Structure formats: C-alpha cells, structure tokens
C-alpha cells in the first residue's frame, strides 16, 4: 500500500521498486 509519509505512524521506508519514484511504503 502506498501511503503518505506524514500520515504513516508506523515504520516508513522506500521500497526498491518505487525507489525512483520515491514511493513510501509502510510495513
């Protein structure tokens, strides 16, 4: 799930697949 970094309260990291787009994922 693609989420907003600010809205994310859990662990945030940039996924390798969305690295070039800078998509933030929560796990």
Swiss-Prot record:
Cofactor note: Divalent metal cations. Maximum activity was observed with Mg(2+).
EC code: 2.7.1.4
Top EC group: transferase
UniProt note on regulation of activity: Inhibition by zinc ions.
Induction: Induced by sucrose.
Keywords: ATP-binding, Carbohydrate metabolism, Kinase, Magnesium, Metal-binding, Nucleotide-binding, Transferase, Zinc
Keyword ATP-binding: yes
GO MF assignments: ATP binding; fructokinase activity; metal ion binding
One GO BP annotation of this record: carbohydrate catabolic process
Influence of pH: Optimum pH is 6.5-7.5.
Reactions catalysed: D-fructose + ATP = D-fructose 6-phosphate + ADP + H(+)
Highest taxon listed in the record's lineage: Bacteria
Cofactor list: Mg(2+)
Family according to the record: Belongs to the ROK (NagC/XylR) family.
Subunit structure as annotated in this protein's UniProt entry: Homodimer.
Protein name in the entry: Fructokinase
Originating organism: Fusobacterium mortiferum
């Amino acid at each position: 799930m693609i989420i907003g970094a600010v809205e994310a309260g859990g662990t945030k990291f940039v996924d390798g697949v969305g690295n070039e787009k800078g998509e933030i994922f929560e796990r």
